[in-house]
């Protein structure tokens, strides 16, 4: 849903 700090944290809740 949100991809603001997609590179800072692993893709678990950002995707």
Swiss-Prot record:
Keywords: Disulfide bond, Neurotoxin, Presynaptic neurotoxin, Secreted, Toxin. One of its GO terms (molecular function) is toxin activity. It is found in: Secreted. GO terms for cellular component: extracellular region. Expressed by the venom gland. It comes from the Eukaryota. Residues 1-15 form the BPTI/Kunitz inhibitor domain. Belongs to the venom Kunitz-type family. Neurotoxin T2 is a presynaptic neurotoxin of the venom that exhibits indirect hemolytic activity against human erythrocytes. The B chain is homologous to venom basic protease inhibitors but has no protease inhibitor activity and is non-toxic. Heterodimer; disulfide-linked. The A chains have phospholipase A2 activity and the B chains show homology with the basic protease inhibitors. This is Kunitz-type serine protease inhibitor homolog T2 B chain. It comes from Bungarus candidus.
